Amino acid sequence: LMAKDVTDGKSKDAGITKKMTVYTSAESHYSIPKNAAFMGIGREQVRYITANDLGEMQPAELEKAISDDIAAGYTPFFVNVTAGTTVLGAFDDIEAIHKICKKYHLWLHVDGAYCGGVIFSEKYNHLVKGIELSDSFSFNAHKMLGTPLTCSIIVTKHKEALYKSFSNDAEYLYQTDGDDFNLGKTSIQCGRRNDALKLWTLWKSVGNKGIEDMVNQQFYLADVARKYVQEHPDYELYSFENSISVCFNYKNIPAADLCTRLYEKAATLVGFGKFRETEFVRLITINANNTEEDILRFFKVLEENSSL
């Protein structure tokens, strides 16, 4: 919404009159086209950029799509970079994509809903190198940081854009001048729950080191799971290092069938995902309270309950 209003300052009052286009990875979250529909941009104006073999958006393909749209009379305005794709947990190259956004004067957003918590880890924050170059960044503390639902944060370097896009005068509200703490002026909601308290209490409770340890533990557990898969010939690994999504298949059993069996036997609950034409079991090590023993027990339970 901020990106739209920055690109077309009249659209907030007069409505959208330009053919505006959005760019995102083909592996990004479904909320991108959903929000394009809500805003009146239209799902058909979302351009899905192909990913490489690691699931990362390809900058060269992005620039080509932008250039082609400009030539066709469209108005590109927003590029979404994903920090932790839903299936593979891939991180798009922020720095490379920022250069393209700067060249074409586009708003760069980093969607860190899933794995944006890596900003708290000295060991893994390189995965979002260049995040300070973005115009906005969002992450869900109820994912990697484990706060209660819902606790979502958006950060932008354009404070004035928040006010221009979300403020709306009402005589019976906002009667104090200069109230920077009144989020009704800078967000869609007016009345709202104090969701920020969830992150604040966690931070006060465990501190920077505690949050960093939580994030690092999730990657450690993923390493444990990947090592197990790699060392056992009945498994085939489909994911990669530096991801908390561990994707694999077992004994060539269709992933959907295997996950359904485990669920129906009340053995364990794990989901499945798909990248390109391959479907696989998708183990997410996002619970920092788990241990190495819990991960190894998961595989034992899976193996014992995999047959019909």
Feature names for model-found ranges:
Residues F275-L308:
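PLP-dependent enzyme catalytic core of the Aspartate aminotransferase-like
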Residues T156, F248-N252, T285-N287:
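Short beta-strand-to-loop capping motifs
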Residues T85, Y104, K129-Q230:
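Active-site C-terminal subdomain of aminotransferase-like
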Residues A36, C101, V229-Q230, L262-Y263:
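A generic structural signal for well-ordered alpha-helical segments
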Residues L1-A161:
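Conserved PLP-enzyme active-site core in the AAT-like
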Residues T17, S239-I244, K274-F280:
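Short Gly/Ser/Thr- and Asp/Glu-enriched loop/turn motifs at secondary-structure junctions
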Residues Y235-L262:
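Conserved PLP-binding catalytic core of the aspartate aminotransferase-like
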